Amino acid sequence: MNQSTDDKSRLSLIWYGVAIFMSSAVLLVLEITAGRLIAPYVGVSLYSWTSIIGVILAGLSLGNWLGGRWADKGGGETAAGIVLALAGLTSIFSLLVLTFIAPVLQSSMLDLISASFIYVFTMFFVPSVLLGVVTPLLTTLALKLDVRTGHIVGRMHALAALGSIIGTFATGYWLVQYFGTRNVVLGAAFCLFVLAAPFFRRVPT
């Protein structure tokens, strides 16, 4: 019985790590593709990339804070599944937002800085917040299964950083070139749905 419990805990820890790694990778996939998506409307400049990096980091920070509070209030695996699924939905929705907002901003008299910020904020702030929730939420769940606090926190943050690195290089060097920007965003959303599913089915318990 104890062996079975240990095996389940080990599988849960592995899956939490996979989810943190992949969600962090997806966030950077969205960040890199954001530059490509808004380039036809505001170009590629210091202003556009400042907006992209700033907005996504702001969303990530807010998500980390919310995720920590949610975890302290008892957020469990179902909460993680909900967040991942919503992140997938809002990632798809970002493409629809661009379709509607582009004509409005193009016909406005907004300067480049304001337009860049509005594009990125309306498209990617919410997905960034949702993805930011994942790491503190799952790290807290992992700490309930392994008392080695430093080991678990360090591992999860390392996986998040590694996922971000892989997501950055994979998108910039390979994914966009071979699949196109919109398909990459759709693929990222699909990946989030796949990550969310086991949490609803409670496979990692």
Short names for language-model regions:
Residues M1-T205:
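Alpha-helical transmembrane segments of multi-pass membrane proteins
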